[in-house]
């Protein structure tokens, strides 16, 4: 068995509304593929996105995405005033480096190299936006709505009729 100590790992927490989370996940997937970094995604149901992953999407085929547990809320949630920044204490112990969601925009403005940052390290990142060039074909590869959501979409399309405006 190979020594796994030097393997790159990224625990990724997407945040914001659905569109923001999907853009952030696509960026994290591209980062993972570009660097050979093992990607784990933890999905938090919160005020920004009031649904669990499994309520809207089928499981991802090639990436580990799981719903957040109560323990995850303590350890992996985004550090904020309302959780007294407690998760940051655990994250500083568990990860070599971390990027919080509010750090991403300033880093992008400085042309930060996210790939160099992630490669060879055990990292944590929370994010609500894309970071890096996004391959739009990944959206359909990664995100497959549940059958119930597909049926709701079909019903809504039928109601639009033949001449929708907008």
Segments from the language model and where they lie:
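Juxtamembrane luminal stem/stalk of type II transmembrane Golgi/ER carbohydrate-processing enzymes
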Residues: 1-9
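Short, hydrophobic/glycine-enriched beta-strand segments
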Residues: 8-15, 165-166
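A short, glycine/small-residue-rich beta-strand->loop->alpha-helix junction that serves as a flexible
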Residues: 14-23
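Short amphipathic alpha-helix
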Residues: 24-31
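A short beta-strand-loop structural module common to alpha/beta enzyme folds
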Residues: 38-48
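Secretory-pathway luminal glycosyltransferase catalytic domains
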Residues: 52-166
């Amino acid at each position: 068995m190979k020594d796994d100590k030097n393997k790159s790992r990224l625990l990724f927490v997407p945040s914001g509304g659905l569109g923001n989370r999907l853009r952030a996940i696509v960026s994290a997937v591209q980062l993972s593929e570009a660097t050979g970094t093992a990607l784990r995604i933890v999905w938090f149901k919160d005020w920004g996105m009031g649904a669990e992953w499994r309520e809207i999407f089928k499981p991802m085929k090639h990436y580990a995405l799981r719903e957040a547990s109560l323990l995850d809320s303590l350890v992996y949630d985004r550090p904020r005033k309302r959780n007294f920044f407690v998760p940051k204490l655990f994250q500083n112990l568990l990860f070599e480096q971390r990027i919080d969601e509010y750090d991403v925009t300033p880093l992008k403005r400085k042309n930060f190299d996210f790939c160099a940052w992630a490669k060879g390290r055990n990292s944590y990142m929370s994010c609500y936006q894309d970071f890096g060039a996004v391959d739009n074909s990944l959206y359909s590869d990664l995100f497959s709505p549940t059958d119930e959501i597909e049926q709701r979409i079909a019903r809504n399309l039928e109601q639009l009729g033949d001449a929708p405006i907008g």
